[in-house]
């Protein structure tokens, strides 16, 4: 199973379920019921800052699975059929890789390195940034597209399909409906600005033709 395959499954799982990066990286197969297309989301894999090493002057951090701060962050979500198919194949591929590996640290994790250890969140960021640089994707303001923007995209797609804001709030597990509304409003304004810029270009070309 190639690294590119693992990243692709991770990105599409985050997008399809509106997950946070840490939530996806902490997923375990026991949290996923593929037969009934249901997933239990809650903990988050994070790198915690350690104590300062007096000799080196550096802090030794550690990876840890952190429980959600709010009750709404723990939830059972329905899995889109496309993501179910993706995860089924990923499970088969991972099992084959695990059998071929000399060492495999944790057979329960959904997303791992080539030796079964948790994926470092910073490495996920690096892989995502490399993909965006390769295909030339940026945000309208010129800044980098973040992994977290996949979550925002999920909200926008759901709204575009006619899903009500309260349901989207439950899917993204926001504690406040206002948070969900603010994200969608911000993204809508960006889309409207791009549309206005496109119209401005069209009008300019029309003006030159009309002269």
PLM ranges: what are they?
Residues 26-32, 169-175, 183-186:
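A short, basic/aromatic helix-end/turn motif that makes direct DNA contacts
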Residues 36, 43-83, 96, 103, ...:
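C-terminal secondary-structure termini that scaffold catalytic or DNA-interacting sites
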Residues 23, 40, 167, 179:
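Residues in the helix-turn-helix
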Residues 1-27, 35, 46, 70-74, ...:
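Basic, Lys/Arg- and aromatic-enriched nucleic-acid-binding interface segment
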Residues 1-8, 17, 77, 92-102, ...:
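Short, basic (Lys/Arg/His-rich) helix/loop patches that form interaction surfaces
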Residues 14-17, 21, 28-29, 36, ...:
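Active-site proximal loops enriched in glycine and acidic residues that flank catalytic Cys/His/Asp
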Residues 27, 90-93:
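Residue-level signal for well-ordered alpha-helical positions
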